[in-house]
A protein has these predicted regions:
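DG-centered beta-turn motif at the end of beta-strands
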Residues: 54-59, 250-256
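Substrate-binding/active-site groove segments that recognize
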Residues: 271-279
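A long, amphipathic alpha-helix that forms part
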Residues: 32-42, 175, 211-249, 279-281, ...
Length: 361
């Protein structure tokens, strides 16, 4: 495997021993080494086509009408429409594993999680598992490549076959996708700016009034970002389905958002880890693997934490390896996480302590 090159300040950050930067030290060299030990399970063959994984930013499902039907503002008209089809399942009890991006995605995009092996020294990246299964991988990011806050995510992202680091509004993801080189079977990852504060900077000014969010809404600016995201998802989905042989599309957020304290470790509130989780499987894909959507819909009201994205995507996309565990795969009949077992804040908080657990669905 070719050596991956990162900005110098990321490597300097590895010398820091505290907080998120300890993750960099754990991953440095380990991802390459562990990738050499990947063994793909036999009998898996996903069909050719395009598979999309969209990683949102600071999206709180409590503000998304598809997940919280009694919410006053229709922030998710496309999601809400799709929920009524046979092709889509939602995770109404989805949580982030940590209320910051770098800590959350370092687990979501690797085989490490809060329940089994928590050490990134022993982990592989999702990109490496997918490549072992015959996929080409693309990473499109609208966040910084070289900031220290995104260092671990950059290290994982750069394991993709191609990376694209954009400075435009999120809606430009469709332009980037349209210009990708042809690929027989590919997974496209998109990392959005999403709903990160400051909210007014996430939506182009000329689109601010396009989504019907009431000016009387106390969380107007935040809710506009969610409606803007929903519109983007619709555009990407329709293009990929029409022109790219779309087989599957997954969306989840890195973490949620509190309307007073935003997100972070102190103070901590559970809405900081309330996230959306959306899965689309094409009719063609469902015909090949009918049990997947059955299980996803069966688990819709069961707790899920996004450090299990690795196992779930591997299961959905037929990329199961010796690092895969069906008990952590939301699409598997063996999925076994319960509310009492579920954790966040990397094991320091119990989901069962969340007084808002029953707010969605």
């Amino acid at each position: 495997m070719a050596m991956h090159v990162f900005p110098l300040n990321i490597y300097r950050a590895m010398h820091k021993r505290d907080g998120a930067y300890a993750l960099l030290e754990q991953m440095n060299g380990s991802l390459d080494k562990n990738a050499e030990n990947i063994i793909l399970q036999k009998g898996q063959q996903a069909p050719d086509g395009t598979y999309i994984v969209i990683v949102g930013e600071s999206a709180n499902r409590d503000h998304m009408k598809a997940f919280t039907p009694h919410y006053a503002e229709n922030t998710t008209p496309w999601f809400s429409e799709m929920v009524g089809t046979e092709d889509v399942a939602l995770g109404y009890k989805a949580y982030s594993n940590f209320p910051t991006t770098i800590m959350s995605l370092s687990y979501a995009l690797t085989s490490a999680n809060q329940y089994g092996d928590t050490s990134l020294k022993n982990a592989i990246s999702l990109m490496d598992a997918l490549r072992a299964a015959g996929y080409e991988t693309d990473w499109i990011s609208f966040q910084s490549r070289s900031s220290l806050a995104s260092a671990a995510v950059t290290m994982i992202a750069e394991r993709s076959d191609r990376t694209y680091w954009e400075q435009d509004p999120d809606e430009k993801m469709l332009d980037v996708i349209q210009k990708l080189p042809p690929a027989k079977k590919r997974v496209i990852f998109v990392h959005m700016n999403g709903s990160h504060y400051s909210y007014t900077s996430r939506v182009p000014e000329h689109r601010w009034n396009d989504f019907g969010i009431s000016t009387q809404d106390p969380d107007h600016d935040y809710d506009v970002t969610l409606a803007y995201n929903d519109w983007i998802f619709k555009n990407v989905f329709e293009y990929a389905r029409e022109h790219m042989h779309l087989q599957a599309m997954i969306y989840f957020s890195d973490h949620g958002e509190n309307m007073v304290h935003y997100h972070g470790t102190s103070p901590f509130f559970f809405d900081m880890v309330h996230i959306p989780f959306f899965v689309y499987l094409s009719p063609e894909y469902r015909a090949l693997y009918p049990e997947l959507m059955v299980q996803l819909k069966k688990h819709a009201q069961i707790v899920f934490t996004n450090d299990l994205i690795f196992d779930t995507v591997a299961g959905l996309f037929q990329a199961k390896t010796n690092f895969y565990n069906p008990e952590y795969d939301f699409s598997s009949p063996q999925y076994s996480l319960t509310k009492e077992q579920a954790l966040t804040f990397h094991g320091k908080e119990k989901i069962s302590d969340d007084l808002g657990f029953h707010i969605n669905g």
